[in-house]
Amino acid sequence: MPVNVLIVYDPKGPAIEALAAAAGKGATATGVAEVVLRRVQEATLEDLLAADALMLGSPNWSGITGSLKLWLDETGDLWEDGSLAGKPAAAFTTGWGRHSGIEMTLLQLIHWLLACGMIVVGLPWTDRMRSSASYYGATATGGVTPEDLMQAEELGARLAKVAAKLQAP
C-alpha cells in the first residue's frame, strides 16, 4: 500500500511552485508514494492527519510567510495531542539571495516539525550542494535551476522512502 505524502506550500512565486512540483515528482517516482500537493490556502487539518509524511514549503520572506504561519498555528490541537509525532517530514524554500535568510526559513519550518515530534528528513552531502540546496532541505536562489529541481526531487524521494520504511512491518 503506498504511503500518502502531503506537500503543503505557500504559492507566493513561481519558484516555490516549481520546487513543490519537483518534490512531488521525486516522491511519486519511487513507486511507494501517492502525493497530495496543496497550496496552504487549500490545505486542511484532515489532509494533515491523513498524511503518512509531510513536506512544508515557503518562500523566504524574512522567515516563513504569514499565510503558512497562520495555517501552522491552527494545528495546535494536533501538536498538543501528538497526532503528528513519528511521521517523517521535510522542508523547502526559495529566496532571492543565497545569504538572504534561506537557511533560517528552513530552520523555522524544521522547528515546527520537531515541535510536533516529527522525524526530519534532510539531504546528504553531494557536490551539487556547492551551488544548490542545503542539508536542511531543498532550496532555490533567484531563479530555479535544473540542480535545484534535482535536489527537490531527491528530497521528495528520500521522504517517500523513509515513510515507506516506517510503515513496513
Give the label of every model feature segment.
Residues 90-131:
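Short, glycine-/small-residue-rich phosphate/pyrophosphate-handling segment
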Residues 85-88:
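Short, proline-enriched alpha-helix->beta-strand connector loops that line the catalytic pocket
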Residues 1-83, 129-131, 136, 140-169:
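N-terminal beta1-alpha1-beta2 submodule of the flavodoxin-like/Rossmannoid cofactor-binding fold
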